[in-house]
Design a protein with these regions (language model features):
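Hydrophobic transmembrane alpha-helices and their immediate loop junctions
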Residues: 1-379
Length: 379
């Protein structure tokens, strides 16, 4: 059970970041060997079954290319202050998981662009290596040539301006920088991503037809699979943009209600009776909430001896949401609620290290639902 959350088999770590081969990677390895192996066998009949060993070596070189691409993202992400959680090479090439507050367009663009640049460097290194390998080392030259082509293609393809490709993140950052709106950047890059997805399938089908050839079924199906992945990623970016625009309509102040702060050792009779009370431990860490209704239910002579800790409802870890001001939108609150999950009912809002009040998840949802409803124009 300890390994249940792992995305695959761990290769090692990079500056503390675990690097995995995803569980879907063997699928792409089998596809590559099944397609590249016969091509090698046709070109070099003397190799026999060794052609498939050459194809297997190519899958390892392809894996190194993917890891290099994702490692570039991870290293620059760490440099820009991102918390990088893992690197995974999987069916879709690979991905780097990290946590960030989308601090700036520059950070987003830098993290995005270095992945394709890493592939471009590998392609250039391979091209230079071709000139150093003797002509009679045909298999070595074949492998190096395949690495050059693959990395060159990946570098160019990933720079196409559409989500979820790296070029899409660069486009997103540019629009974000020009408009000051991350939602606008995501929306533009998301729709461009859908154009790229459709164009990719069209290119796979139309290009052979222009040459007077019949499109190969395998490559058409593969392009449809890749385009489907691109379409879903682009759709996610569009949905995120729309959500961001919705969140921007509601300010933290709109859903915030006041709350008093009290140590968990305080007597209940000494607590404010008409407002919520946030209970903190001896270190000042908030861990519970007492609603006015709970104080009223416990009212009576015995209340004089009841401690706040006995009445407080324990809150789940992650219930504290930090914001720079109560005048910002509720994006940080929504993220905090999503991170905690369904168990949370309240968020404690903290500004500059000081509690500012409480936000009920129900009130947050109601405010967003109200903001989403179109307003009727005055008659």
């Amino acid at each position: 059970m300890a390994n249940a959350d792992r995305p695959g088999w761990q290769l090692g770590t990079l500056r503390g970041v675990p690097v995995y081969i995803g569980r879907t990677w063997p699928i792409i390895a089998v596809v590559v060997i099944a397609t590249f192996g016969p091509q090698v066998a046709d070109a070099y009949p003397d190799l026999g079954a060794g052609a498939y060993i050459v194809a297997f070596i190519y899958t390892l070189l392809l894996l190194l290319s993917v890891v290099a691409h994702e490692a570039a993202h991870a290293l620059v992400g760490q440099w820009r202050g991102y918390h990088v959680r893992r690197i995974v090479a999987d069916l879709w090439g690979g991905h780097t998981a990290y946590d960030t507050d989308d601090s700036s367009p520059m950070s987003s663009a830098l993290v995005a662009v270095v992945g394709p640049l890493a592939n471009a460097v590998l392609a250039l290194a391979g091209w230079l290596a071709l000139h150093a390998v003797a002509d009679d080392r045909e298999v070595a030259r074949l492998l190096i040539g395949a690495v050059v082509f693959t990395n060159g293609f990946v570098a160019i393809f990933n720079l196409l301006p559409g989500m979820p490709l790296d070029g899409g993140f660069i486009l997103d950052a540019v629009v974000w920088r020009l408009t000051g709106s991350r939602s606008a950047g995501l929306l533009v890059a998301g729709w461009c991503g859908r154009v790229v997805a459709v164009g990719f399938v069209g290119w796979t089908v139309v290009r052979p037809l222009v040459r007077g050839e019949t499109p190969q079924t395998f490559y058409v199906l593969w392009s449809v699979l890749i385009a489907g992945f691109l379409w879903v990623g682009a759709g996610n970016a569009i949905a995120r943009a729309r959500a961001g625009r919705l969140f921007a309509r509601v300010r933290v102040r709109d859903v915030l209600r006041p709350a008093a702060i009290a140590p968990d050792t305080a007597l209940a009779a000494q607590l404010p009776q008409a407002t919520d009370v946030v209970v903190v431990d001896q270190r000042g860490v908030p861990w519970g909430v007492i609603a006015p209704a709970e104080l009223q239910r416990a009212a009576g002579p015995g209340l004089q001896e009841v401690r706040a800790a006995a009445l407080a409802r324990v809150q789940p870890a992650g219930w504290v949401a930090e914001v720079p001001s109560v005048d910002v939108d509720v994006t940080a609150l929504v993220r905090a609620a999503q991170d905690v999950g369904g168990a949370i009912q309240e968020l404690l809002v903290v500004v500059d290290g000081q509690p500012a009040g409480l936000v009920a998840i129900q009130a947050l949802g109601d405010a967003l639902a109200a903001a989403e409803r179109p307003t009727s124009a005055p008659v």
